[in-house]
Regions:
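Recognition helix of helix-turn-helix/homeodomain-like DNA-binding domains
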Residues: 37-53
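Conserved hydrophobic/aromatic packing and binding residues within compact polymer-binding modules
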Residues: 17, 31-32, 42-46, 74
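Short, basic-rich loop-to-helix N-cap that marks the start of a DNA-contacting helix
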Residues: 49-65
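A short, Lys/Arg-rich alpha-helix, primarily the initiator
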Residues: 1-24
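Residues within the helices of the helix-turn-helix
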Residues: 18, 29, 61
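The alpha-helix within a helix-turn-helix
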Residues: 21, 32, 64
Length: 77
């Protein structure tokens, strides 16, 4: 993997979360509710890295458990 900036890595992670979420047939709202949020703002913003919003390690751990995938899958370009 080339040297990535944090911004590039956050974008890759967001794209991968969106990809795996869609593969599992979940909407942003479904994922948000499963993570314990009442709205899609965290998921929708972080998936597209809107205004610097990104997933933190706790988010990624929860998402990997919900989607039943390895957390490392989110880091693959």
């Amino acid at each position: 993997m080339k040297n990535l900036t944090p911004d590039e890595l956050y974008k890759i992670i967001g794209q991968n979360v969106a990809k795996y979420r869609k593969e599992k047939g979940l909407s942003q709202l479904d994922l948000s509710l499963a993570m314990g949020y009442k709205s899609v703002s965290v998921v929708s913003g972080a998936e597209i890295y809107y205004n610097g919003k990104h997933f933190n390690i706790e988010h990624l751990l929860k998402i990997s458990q919900i989607l039943n995938i390895e957390i490392s899958e989110f880091l693959k370009p």
